[in-house]
UniProtKB/Swiss-Prot annotation:
Region (Interaction with substrate tRNA): 5-8
BP terms from Gene Ontology: tRNA modification
Highest classification ranks of the organism: Bacteria, Bacillati, Bacillota, Clostridia, Eubacteriales
InterPro entries: Dimethylallyltransferase, IPT, P-loop_NTPase
Quaternary structure and partners: Monomer.
Site (Interaction with substrate tRNA): 71, 94
Protein name, as recorded: tRNA dimethylallyltransferase
Top enzyme category: transferase
Reaction catalysed by this enzyme: adenosine(37) in tRNA + dimethylallyl diphosphate = N(6)-dimethylallyladenosine(37) in tRNA + diphosphate
Function of the molecule: Catalyzes the transfer of a dimethylallyl group onto the adenine at position 37 in tRNAs that read codons beginning with uridine, leading to the formation of N6-(dimethylallyl)adenosine (i(6)A).
NCBIfam families: miaA
Keywords: ATP-binding, Magnesium, Nucleotide-binding, Transferase, tRNA processing
Organism: Desulforamulus reducens (strain ATCC BAA-1160 / DSM 100696 / MI-1) (Desulfotomaculum reducens)
Family note: Belongs to the IPP transferase family.
Any one GO MF annotation of this record: ATP binding
Length: 283
């Protein structure tokens, strides 16, 4: 199992990321989990490099790599032809953007990015000014988002023989489960986890601005009450799920499975194995 969740790479962030437990991993090797500290930088380019190496190692051992998770760009960086080294650079434009940032502030630059490249804006913290400026630099030069530019949209042999599966359900049921999940996180000690992370890492790092953490940090800063923080987290999670679904729905390679049709997760897993039979598995 190879995680394709951009938040699971961080150590000590367990409850807010719904990190799988040892019991849930059931002795099956899980990769790309707990590999960097929350105050360390970790990029999609680093993810791509590490996972490509992992896939080769797993295949060499005669096993089948399963890429699992919901960070669309992480998945696409591995299965498609993304090149993170060729985006154009313009030193003069970058300096102009830096001067603008000095005048209007990091938050205004992040808002500007959200208007032209919402995907990058969602991924980057407003204080990550270097990367915000880099994404703007690429957009202003090419008219494309940084992800669009990095994707080589030409006819090439696919990197892997693969099958893709997506899980979906009734929207209202999904939102109900999101509310239950947030309540469960709070019951399991999300507030304590965030307090300890802020103390240990001085509240620094892009990771602590991730979904489930920034909302609680807002409460700790006195911006709103704890019940309000919980409601904001539920709202933000619903919005994230909607954007996530929109991203994956655009990929016609995905075979969608309606979870409402199955009694339990085991039945869903059996359906996936049935769909894979003949290509990857001998049942």
């Amino acid at each position: 199992m190879i995680s394709a969740d951009s938040m699971l790479v961080y150590r000590d962030m367990d409850i807010g990321t719904a990190k799988p437990t040892l019991e849930e991993m059931a002795g099956i090797p899980h990769h790309m989990i707990d590999i960097v500290n929350p105050n360390e930088e970790f990029s999609v380019a680093t993810y791509q490099s590490r996972v490509e190496e992992l896939i080769n190692q797993i295949i060499d051992r005669g096993n089948l790599p399963l890429l699992v998770g919901g960070t669309g760009l992480y998945i696409r960086s591995v299965i498609d032809h993304y090149d993170f080294t060729t985006a154009p650079k313009d030193d003069r434009l970058r300096e102009c953007l830096k001067r603008e940032a000095e005048q209007v502030g990091a938050a205004a630059m992040h808002k500007k990015l959200s208007e032209v490249d919402p995907q990058s804006a969602e991924r980057l913290h407003p204080n990550d000014l270097r990367r915000v400026i880099r994404a703007l630099e690429v957009y202003y030069q090419t008219g494309k988002t940084i992800a669009e530019y990095q994707y080589k949209d030409q006819v090439e042999k696919p990197k892997y023989n693969l099958k893709m599966f997506g899980l979906t359900m009734d929207r209202q049921l999904l939102y109900q489960r999101i509310e239950q999940r947030v309540d469960l996180m709070m019951a399991r000690g999300l507030l304590t986890e965030v307090k300890e992370l802020v103390e240990q890492y001085n509240g620094l790092g892009t990771a602590l601005q991730g979904l489930g953490y920034k909302e609680i940090i807002g409460y700790l800063k006195g911006e709103y009450s704890l019940p309000e923080a919980v409601e904001i987290l539920k709202r933000n999670t619903r919005r994230f799920a909607k954007r996530q679904l929109t991203w994956f729905r655009a990929d016609n390679r995905i075979f969608w499975i309606e979870m409402d049709r199955f009694e339990n997760k085991k039945a869903v897993a059996n359906e996936i194995m049935k769909q894979m039979a003949g290509d990857f598995l001998t049942l």
